[in-house]
Regions:
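Blade-terminus and WD-like Trp-Asp/Gly-His loop motifs, strongest in beta-propeller folds
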Residues: 21-28, 78-86, 130-136, 167-172
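Conserved blade-ending motifs and adjacent loop-strand segments that build the rim/top face
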Residues: 65-72, 116-133, 153-172
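Short loop/turn segments immediately following beta-strands, especially the blade-tip
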Residues: 47-57, 108-112, 188
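Beta-strand C-termini and the immediately following turn/loop, strongest in propeller blades
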Residues: 32-37, 85-97, 139-144, 177-182
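Structural motif
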Residues: 38-46, 96-105, 143-149, 181-187
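Blade-level signature of beta-propeller repeat domains, shared across WD40, Kelch, NHL, RCC1
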Residues: 170-188
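Surface-exposed loop and turn segments in beta-propeller and other repeat-based domains
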Residues: 1-15, 56-73
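C-terminal amphipathic alpha-helical segment
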Residues: 62-116
Length: 188
């Protein structure tokens, strides 16, 4: 990564604060649950390769950076990669009015030409909490347990009470709960 160059004025214009980072399944992109002053939740996606190979500002203003539609006063919610092209974001509605439990799914390869944001391709009510996905299924975990959703149908297909995973391994198709000093796995 190139060093910071004194006198580089680009950094003075930045008002973006980074949040949780989520690596895409192929390891090529990052999803960031960040925000701007006001505060406005502003999730963005950018190329990890562009970032580490030379453009230290890729996450801020690089050519691969794509913003997912933002929400005032709403960040640090459930996010996950559905596959290498799609991300799921928890929350439907507007936080100034009413947010309902559910997810919005965005295609990060096809920006909306009118807004220049990632294009919303699916939305369905229900999921809330920590999110995980395998391309076909979306998993949402909260204090009551794990809910399993069909992404294509937007329907609840299963529930495991008392199992609230904090980690997901796409490689061996397992979800893990690490509460109470033990690790519980569920293979699907």
């Amino acid at each position: 990564m190139p060093p910071f160059v004194a006198g580089d004025e680009q950094h003075k214009k930045l008002d973006y604060f980074h949040g949780a980072l989520f690596l895409s399944p192929d390891g090529n992109q990052l999803l960031n649950d960040g925000w701007n002053w006001e505060p406005v939740g502003r999730p963005v996606v950018w190329s990890l390769l562009e970032w580490v190979r030379g453009n230290v500002w890729e996450s801020e203003s690089g050519r691969s950076r794509l913003t997912i539609p933002h929400q005032n006063h709403y960040w640090n919610q459930g996010f996950c990669w559905v596959d290498n092209r799609h991300v799921a974001v928890e929350g439907i509605g507007h936080p100034d009015d009413e947010m309902i439990a559910g997810v919005r799914i965005f295609d990060i390869t096809r920006p909306n030409q009118e807004t220049e944001f990632a294009r919303e391709v699916n939305v369905f009510a229900g999921p809330s909490g920590r999110l995980f996905a395998d391309g076909d299924q979306l998993f949402s975990a909260d204090d009551q347990g794990l809910s399993i959703w069909s992404i294509s149908q937007g329907a609840l297909t299963g529930r495991i009470s008392g199992f609230s995973p904090t980690a997901h391994s796409l490689l061996d198709r397992t979800l893990m709960d690490t509460k109470g000093g033990t690790v519980r796995r569920w293979a699907y």
